């Protein structure tokens, strides 16, 4: 039995890594999709601000995702625990801030650059662990991080001669800091017994609620909330974000990330810019 337990744990970890890689591919799709949606909506509402499009997109994207999940998992929600509510709220706080900054930043920078800068959490996470838990970053982790950053730089085709830190780049770096908090919250021992479906629903719905006041503050008119998606391309891009980049990617990440460390998760998520760069070619 003692030999079976480590084997079982290793198998579970390997399965978690595979599922996180799968989810990250769909998450990487969000970068070119959000970029394309930004261009589409600027044609529909040329006078609206990027913050309006960003906040409205978050409200619709996560609101629809949360409602769809609530319909399918209504029975589980009946006995939702206080810690599941708490974890969902914490994840929503970090998530909505990160997504708002990331989506607005995409209006001012390329999808591949946005995906590259978002990977800042693969550096932020081990630094946080080292500072808070007083655990030094091992040479193995250091070289893994260095190799990942170098590889992502090459694959995302980052040109440092023309690279600049403008509004889009700075917003994306701030988003990465918030995503760091989200990743760390998923592995917190306090939430180990939580059911991922329940706190994911809370997270999605609260992200929509948190973004709604920004929609109200930046909307040119009430009709603009409908006109922003009053075309087949805009509606189709929103559907892609809801189904693939939210329902599939987030629920898989929320379910499986606890079986790896936060540092490992951050390194796995670094394949995002590869997919984003490839998809941005089409």
Language-model segments: which ranges?
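C-terminal-most transmembrane helix of multi-pass membrane proteins
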Residues: 2-9, 58, 62-63, 157-158, ...
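Transmembrane alpha-helical segments that form core, pore/gating elements
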Residues: 24, 35, 66-69, 125-126, ...
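Glycine-/small-residue-enriched transmembrane alpha-helix faces in small-molecule transporters
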Residues: 1-56, 93, 101, 161-188, ...
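Membrane-interface helix-cap regions at the ends of transmembrane helices
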Residues: 36, 40, 63-81, 150-163, ...
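Hydrophobic/aromatic residues within transmembrane alpha-helices
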Residues: 37, 57, 105, 110, ...
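Hydrophobic transmembrane alpha-helices of multi-pass small-molecule transport proteins
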Residues: 69, 137-158, 176-179
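C-terminal transmembrane-helix exit sites in multi-pass transporters
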Residues: 76-77, 102, 121-146, 274-282
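Hydrophobic alpha-helical transmembrane segments of multi-pass membrane transport proteins
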Residues: 21-33, 89-108, 154, 173-185, ...
